């Protein structure tokens, strides 16, 4: 349809306003699992590198990271997060116990699928950034359920669904990336709209 690209631009601008983001930092994907697979398979990992996560993650994404680990010989490190959480400080301290000089990626849910916890991510993202660790957030259940300001949260990558609490049709989701890490992304499918100098768009 000749209206497809203008409509997609309109969607990105409306979504950016709702999510506290810039339109150029957002792309539309079919669901958060697809967006997170794009991110995960774009990570340049080596043997011995570590991917840090929690024991509250969505099963499909656990399989995604297992596949990445198998392909790259990176190691998955999973920390146990107690229920209930008492504070953001406690959460950050727990996640820090899993960090080492080999940790390259931190992958956490914003709202967990199996346990419905809202992880207080801002402090742990800042801690990871100070250590040079890439932060990736599974936001499948967050948009529309909690207030989001992606620029303020300041993760490296975030993917969320719009068909849950935002009441959009299935097939409506987004991938967000901070501008300086966007060249890391490699699309799973290359077609119209790919921009070579960015490595994808």
For the regions a language model picked out, list residue spans one by one:
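Pyridoxal 5′-phosphate
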Residues: 1-201
